[in-house]
Amino acid sequence: MAKKKQIGRRVEGWKAKSWYKVYVPEAFGSTPIGETIAADSANLVGRVMSTTLGEIAQDFAKQHIKMKFKISRVAGDAAYTEFIGHELTKDYLRSLVKRRTSRIDSHIMGSTKDGKRIHLTVTCYTLIGANSSQIHAIRNVISAQMATFVAQNDWATVVDGIVTGSISRDMLAQVKGIFPIRRIEVIKSKIESKVIIA
C-alpha cells in the first residue's frame, strides 16, 4: 500500500524559509538581480547567481554578456555579491564568425594586484585569413598585453576594462599593426581562486 505524502510537513518546511533579495556589487550599481530562498542566511554565502549585463544596465545591446556573481555576505534580508566571471553567449560569438577569415583564441592565466588568480579567454577575429606565423604573432601580442594589464591592476579595474570594452580596444590598437583585425573580444573570464595575498 502506497504511503500518503506528508504535505503538511513539506508546507511547514517552506514556511520556515525566508526570501532574500540579491544585489550586484557597487561597481555595477548595487542593482537587485532577483531573490533567493534559504532556511538559514549562512547557507546563502557561496551561492552563485547569473544574469546578463543587459539586465543590470537596462541596455538590450548588452544582453549577450552573461555575468556570474557569488553571494559573499548577508545583512538582514539582503544578500550582497562579488563578481566572479563572465561569458559571451554562443549565438553572439557565432555572429562574429565570417568566411575566409581567422578566429584566434588566447588563454591567459594571471594574478591581479589584489591577489585574484584569474583565467581569461581572448578571441581575435581577422578581416582576412591569417597564416600560422601571423596567428602566432597575434596571439603573442594579445597574451603579453593582457598578462601585463592583469598584473598591473586590481580585479575591479580588470573587470571594468572587460565590460566596458576598453581593454579590447587597446589590444586592437596594438594588433592591427601586425595584421588586418576586425574585432577583439574578451569572451570569458573566471576567478580560479580566492585572494592569495596575506
From Swiss-Prot:
GO BP annotation list: translation
Record keywords: Ribonucleoprotein, Ribosomal protein
One Gene Ontology cellular component annotation held by this UniProt entry: ribonucleoprotein complex
InterPro entries, A to Z: Ribosomal_eS1 (IPR001593), Ribosomal_eS1_arc (IPR030838)
GO function term, MF aspect, one: structural constituent of ribosome
Family to which this protein belongs: Belongs to the eukaryotic ribosomal protein eS1 family.
Xref: HAMAP family: Ribosomal_eS1
Name of this protein: Small ribosomal subunit protein eS1
Organism: Methanosphaerula palustris (strain ATCC BAA-1556 / DSM 19958 / E1-9c)
